[in-house]
Amino acid sequence: GKKPILGICLGHQAIAEVFGGKLGLAPKVMHGKQSQIRFETPSILYQGIEDNRPVMRYHSILIEEMPEEFEVTARSTDDQAIMGIQHKILPIYGLQYHPESIGTPDGLSSIQNFIEKVVK
């Protein structure tokens, strides 16, 4: 459907799996670990946020292969893991990191962008 979706962590992974992507185990467990991310593709979620920002990670599974209908919006700089995705047509977004965490200083801005600019 066309209902806006924002998948966070496991939700991000579930979106990829539902659309035919492939998941795998991360090379190392990233529970309570902070990484920098770089934006790869413009996304409404990152409007007003500077590139190369810290994010908090809590996961041991990653998206290894993206579904064709999606584009990668962000990757971690330390291990090049997929940290953000968006559907090319539908209002579906995923974030591997936790935007609600204190370890993601700009995370609430991403959530606010989703609510104000996608959900409306």
Predicted segments with their positions:
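Phosphate-binding/catalytic loops
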Residues: 52, 95-105
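Histidine-centered divalent metal-coordination motifs
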Residues: 9, 59, 98
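Cysteine-nucleophile active-site neighborhood
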Residues: 1-43, 54, 111-113
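Catalytic beta-strand/loop cores that center a nucleophilic Ser/Cys/Thr
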Residues: 43-90
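Conserved hydrophobic/aromatic beta-strand scaffold that supports enzyme active sites
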Residues: 34-36, 82-84, 94
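Hydrophobic/aromatic beta-strand patches that form the interior of the parallel beta-sheet core
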Residues: 6, 24, 56, 73, ...
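Acyltransferase
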Residues: 102-120
